[in-house]
């Protein structure tokens, strides 16, 4: 009887592993293999950022962390001229704090924080049937956002090298250090 349960446990684990690999896009090895949509509705091939270090952030307009847009824009401007980009992915997953349309999000970001870094269409970051492939890939690193303004450092090859929760601000020494390390500085 124990061998039947052992076989069942092994078969179940194999099925879960296979399903997880399939849900994560299976063969996706690099963030830069993924495609998505810009906030203005145009297609976005993340291969355009290959060779750069990127900071991927799930953002929201009505969150206590929303003022971090200012720090993200400052980081974006300070790092111009280096192979680095901040990428913003609006999400309504946490507290319904990004309820706006794409046009409303764009207007808010421009009017309030003069956001100039690339912004993408609203995504689902949480593990769910409609989770964005972007966040399926990022989640394979062992970290999914616990709230808005979670941050992932992606190296030039498209690998997640660091994760920072919402409370870590864009000017935090540990975040800046992780970016510099990914840049090879």
Could you describe each region identified by the protein language model?
Residues 1-4:
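Positively charged n-region of N-terminal signal peptides that target proteins for export
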Residues 38, 58-62:
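Amphipathic alpha-helical repeat scaffolds
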Residues 65-131:
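Structural microenvironment flanking redox-active thiols in thiol-disulfide oxidoreductases
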Residues 22-47:
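N-terminal "domain-start" segment that seeds a small globular fold
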Residues 133-185:
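Thiol-/selenol-based redox modules, centered on thioredoxin-like
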Residues 16-21:
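Sec/Tat signal peptide C-region and signal peptidase I cleavage site
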Residues 6-15:
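Bacterial N-terminal signal peptides
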């Amino acid at each position: 009887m124990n061998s039947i349960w052992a076989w069942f446990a092994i078969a179940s684990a194999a099925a879960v592993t296979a399903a997880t690999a399939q849900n994560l896009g299976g063969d996706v090895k690099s963030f830069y293999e993924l495609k998505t949509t810009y906030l203005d509705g145009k297609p976005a091939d993340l291969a355009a950022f290959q060779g750069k270090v990127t900071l991927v952030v799930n953002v929201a307009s009505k969150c206590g962390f929303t003022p971090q847009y200012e720090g993200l824009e400052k980081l974006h401007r300070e790092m111009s001229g280096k192979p680095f980009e901040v990428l913003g992915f609006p999400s309504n997953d946490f507290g319904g704090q990004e309820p706006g349309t794409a046009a409303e999000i764009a207007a808010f970001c421009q009017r309030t924080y003069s956001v100039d870094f690339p912004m993408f269409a609203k995504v689902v970051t949480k593990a769910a049937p409609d989770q964005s492939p972007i966040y399926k890939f990022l989640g394979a690193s062992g970290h999914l956002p616990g709230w808005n303004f979670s941050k992932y450092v992606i190296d030039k090859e498209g690998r997640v090298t660091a994760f920072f929760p919402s409370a870590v601000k864009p000017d935090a020494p540990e975040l800046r250090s992780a970016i510099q390390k990914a840049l090879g500085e």
